[in-house]
Design a protein with these regions (language model features):
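N-terminal accessory interaction module
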Residues: 1, 57-58
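N-terminal low-complexity or simple alpha-helical regulatory segments
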Residues: 1-37
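Short, charge-rich binding segments
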Residues: 10-11, 31-36, 43-44, 51, ...
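Glycine- and acidic-residue-biased ligand/ion/polar-headgroup-sensing regions
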Residues: 16, 36-57, 65-67, 94-95
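Short, conserved acidic/polar surface loops in the N-terminal third of protein domains
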Residues: 21, 31-34, 52-57, 103
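Residue-level recognition of well-ordered beta-strand positions that form the cores
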Residues: 22-24, 43-45, 92, 199
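Alpha-helical bundle regulatory/interaction domains
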Residues: 53, 62-184, 191
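Basic/polar phosphate-binding segments, predominantly the helix-turn-helix DNA-binding elements
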Residues: 166-174, 193, 197-209
Length: 209
C-alpha cells in the first residue's frame, strides 16, 4: 500500500453516477478492466495530478483545473498519482440509459436541449480523449460541487450535473477543447528515471543542455 483513498459515490439519475475522489497515495487501481464504449466519463481535477496507463502502452495526464472527457472504450491497465495526492470529481454516464431519462426531463421542462450522444461525439471522435483546461465557467460549476453540503446532495448534484451537460452541449465550448497527447511508455519511463536520479542527487546542479 502507498497510502489511502476515499471514493464517495452518488447515483444522480438512472445511468448517471457521481464520485468524489480523495487520494493520498502514489499508486491507484485499475477501475476499467473492460472497455465500455457506450459510457462517457468526465474527470475534473481540483488538486494534484492523475496518470493513466492504457493497455496499448500509452499514458495520459490531467492536472489541477483540467476537465478530461472520454469514452471508456480504451482498457485501463493502471492509474497513479505522481504528486502522491489527488482530489477531484468523476461523472460516468451510460449513454443509452441516461439518454431516455434526459429526454423525459426535457419533455417536462420544455426545452432542456441536452443531447448526450452529441456531446460524446463532439469531444470524443474516434475514441480520443479531450481536455478543457482552466475554463472559468466549468471551474465555477465544479467549485460549487466541491462545496455542496451533504444534506443537499440528493437534489443539488442533479441540478449542477444537468447544468454542466447543458454547457458542454454548446458548440462554443466544444470548439475550445484541447486534445491531450498520448505519451509512449518509453517517454514516460525515461522521464521517471530522470526524476528519480535528480531526487536522489539533490546537491547536484542541473541544466537543460
Amino acid at each position: 500500500e502507498t497510502g489511502e483513498g476515499i471514493i464517495t459515490q452518488y447515483i444522480i439519475l438512472p445511468g448517471i453516477q457521481f464520485f468524489y475522489n480523495d487520494f493520498h497515495m502514489s499508486n491507484g487501481q485499475n477501475q476499467n478492466k473492460l472497455p465500455h464504449a457506450d459510457v462517457l466519463e468526465l474527470n475534473h481535477c481540483r488538486e494534484g495530478r492523475f496518470e493513466c496507463r492504457f493497455a496499448n502502452g500509452t499514458y495520459q495526464y490531467i492536472g489541477s483545473g483540467d476537465l478530461a472527457i472520454n469514452l471508456l472504450s480504451n482498457q485501463t491497465v493502471s492509474t497513479s498519482f505522481p504528486l502522491s495526492h489527488y482530489h477531484g470529481i468523476s461523472i460516468t454516464i451510460d449513454l443509452q440509459k441516461a439518454d431516455s431519462v434526459i429526454r423525459k426531463i426535457d419533455e417536462m421542462t420544455g426545452g432542456l436541449d441536452i443531447d448526450l450522444f452529441s456531446i460524446a461525439n463532439g469531444f470524443c471522435k474516434n475514441g480520443t480523449c479531450a481536455v478543457i483546461r482552466n475554463q472559468n465557467k466549468i471551474n465555477h460549476i465544479f467549485s460549487e460541487l466541491y462545496c455542496t453540503k451533504p444534506y443537499m446532495h440528493a437534489s443539488y448534484l442533479k441540478v449542477k450535473v444537468l447544468e454542466l451537460l447543458l454547457y458542454l452541449g454548446t458548440e462554443k465550448i466544444q470548439n475550445t477543447q484541447v486534445k491531450v497527447p498520448y505519451f509512449a511508455h518509453t517517454q514516460v519511463k525515461k522521464v521517471k528515471e530522470i526524476q528519480k536520479y535528480m531526487v536522489s542527487n539533490l546537491r547536484q546542479h542541473y541544466t537543460l543542455e
